[in-house]
Every structure is written in C-alpha cells, then in structure tokens.
Amino acid sequence: PNIEFFLANVDPNGNSTNGIIRKYTEREEFLMFEDIFSNEITLDEVKFSETDGSDAWDTQKYLNIWVCNIGSLDVLGLELGQVYGYAYPPTNIDDALATLGDVVVPDWPVDMLSNDENVQGVVLHYTALGRNNPSANEDGMTENNLGRAAVHEVAHYLGLRHIWGDALAFFGDDGCSVDDGIEDTPNQDAASNFVCNFDQDTCSDGTDDFPDMV
C-alpha cells in the first residue's frame, strides 16, 4: 500500500494545530538506560509529561515523533557513541504473539515491541534534523542530518529491519544466516558503520546476489 505522512492539522481534541508541540523541560538529556544492568529504556520517559516529557497523541491516528537530547551511551565512563534515534512499530507484544506467522511486523523480534501503545512512535536526537538547525553536524556525522535519521527510524516504525537482521557478531551471530524478513533485499553480514562502499558484498546469495547497498 502507498503510505503518505503529513503534519497533523487537527489535534486529538479537534482543535487546529500545525502538528508541532514545543515542550519546555528541566531535563538536560534523556538516557537510553539508567545503568548498564537495566533492561528498561529510560529514554521512553520523553514520552510522558509526568517524567518531564510530552504525552503521545492517539497512536491509532497519529505517528508521534519526539525530538530531544538523547544522552550518549557510556559504560563505566567509556563513551560508546551517540544514538540518533529509535522506534517502536505500531503493534504490541500480545498481538504479535497471537498472529505469529501472519504479516503484523515481519520477522521483527517480539522483545523489541512494546505493550504500551503510548510509547509507539519515533524518537530522534535534536541534532539529526532540520535545514536551519544550528546544532546539526556538531559531531561531524553528516550522514544523519536533513531528516536521514528520521527516514531510517520511520522505516523501523513501519516494520523494516536492518538488512543484516540485527545479527550481533560480538555474540557469534552470522549475519549471512539471519534474515530481515524482506525477500528482495540481499543478506549482509553486519552493519556498514557509515562507510558507503557500494561494491561491498559480504554474503553470497547465489545467482540473485547483489551488493549490500542497493
């Protein structure tokens, strides 16, 4: 199906709007995890006014996108890098389990969904979008600006995974044997890590083989 997004012009209460809410917060940043031993994504606090974030609009009618300062990942003082965004698809764990095998979210890990529909949507780092953003590219990562990160995360929201199926080589996963659930994308061994090598071909897919970046 063809899907088209546009800024909302009517809010959940029926009032006219430009679809943008600017919320003042005392929080300097929102963290992915409060500590390295936690499975709770505390960054989701940006989605609730009670934790100094902003409440979602009806997720059955709106694609919510939160923009905030996402704290960089670090473990015991060792900085691991900056997360520019993440997304929850618009389905929950119970529905995914009940319809396993049907097209709900193709080949999407159930533990990466949420039963709380109020967190479903996209979160973006504030440096990763806007043509007149004075903070854009402050880290030198031009690959993420001008909405590229938004396109990437909205694709996740719609159920598209990374083409290496999110295999983790660190834990011994073989990306060539882990699929993304989409038949016409080539297998890829691992993430390209921002290197745009259009000739790279890390997996052999037989007669229908294509480079990783097509």
Predicted region positions:
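Metzincin-family zinc-dependent endopeptidase catalytic domain
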Residues: P1-D201
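Extracellular low-complexity, Gly/Ser/Thr-rich intrinsically disordered linkers
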Residues: D205-V214
